[in-house]
A protein has these predicted regions:
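Anionic ligand-binding catalytic core segments
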Residues: 1-41, 46, 50-204
C-alpha cells in the first residue's frame, strides 16, 4: 500500500480489483468496522480480514466473513476505563484509533439493533467462562455503551460531537464518569432526548 493512501480506500480498491463491486466492498468495510467497535476488538490487523475464493476455481466469492476477533471485549483491560477512554482507544487496524475507524462508516444500515445482545445476554454468555466472572458487569456495560454510541452515530451525529457531549456530562458531574452512568443517562432520557442535547451542545 502506498504510504500516502488511506488504508480503508486501499482495501476497498483491492476488493474491487478482485471483482467485488464498490457498493458491496464499502458495505462490508462499514459492517466489519461497526462490529469491531461494538465488541471493542483492537486487533483487526492485515492478516485478520481478506477475500474469500472458491478453492477449486479460485474465483472470488466475496469478502471473507469476520474472523479472529479474540482481542476484544476487554480481553486484557483489567482496570476500570472511563467513557472517554473508550472514545479514543488505540487499535491495530486500518486506522490507528477506533475513533478514526468508526468515523469512516457512512451507513449503519447493516446493523439490526433489535437483534443485538442486551446487557443481560452479554452477561449470560460470558458467565459460562468462570474466569471472567469478576468482569461480567463491566463487559456488559461496555458493550451497552458502545451500542448506545452506534445508535447515536446512526442518526448522523459526528463522532467528535458525541465525544464532546460526554465530556460535558462528566464535567457537570464526576459521578457520570463511568460507562454505566452514561448508559443510564441515555436510557433514562431516550436517544431522542440525547440527540436534542447534542443540538444544544453546538452553541456551548
Amino acid at each position: 500500500k502506498p504510504n500516502n493512501q488511506d488504508a480503508c480506500l486501499f482495501y476497498k480498491a483491492c476488493m474491487e480489483k478482485e471483482g467485488i463491486n464498490e457498493t458491496k466492498a464499502k458495505e462490508f468495510i462499514d459492517y466489519q468496522t461497526t462490529i469491531d467497535f461494538l465488541i471493542t476488538n483492537i486487533d483487526r490487523h492485515l492478516n485478520n480480514f481478506g477475500i474469500l475464493r472458491d478453492s477449486n476455481t479460485l474465483k472470488t466469492i466475496g469478502p471473507a466473513p469476520i474472523y479472529d476477533s479474540g482481542n476484544s471485549m476487554l480481553y486484557k483491560n483489567y482496570l476500570e476505563s472511563t467513557p472517554l477512554d473508550f472514545m479514543s482507544l488505540k487499535v491495530n487496524a486500518l486506522c490507528k484509533s477506533e475513533s478514526l475507524l468508526i468515523s469512516k462508516v457512512s451507513d449503519f444500515k447493516n446493523i439490526d439493533f433489535s437483534k443485538l445482545p442486551t446487557k443481560e445476554n452479554v452477561k449470560d454468555f460470558y458467565k459460562k467462562d468462570v474466569t471472567l466472572s469478576y468482569n461480567l458487569e463491566r463487559m456488559a456495560d461496555t458493550f451497552e455503551y458502545k451500542k448506545n454510541i452506534i445508535r447515536i452515530l446512526s442518526n448522523g451525529v459526528p463522532y467528535k460531537t458525541v465525544e464532546s457531549e460526554i465530556k460535558h456530562l462528566i464535567s457537570k458531574n464526576e459521578s457520570n464518569n463511568s460507562t454505566s452512568a452514561i448508559n443510564q443517562i441515555i436510557e433514562k432520557n431516550g436517544i431522542e432526548s440525547f440527540l436534542h442535547s447534542l443540538e444544544g451542545s453546538k452553541i456551548r
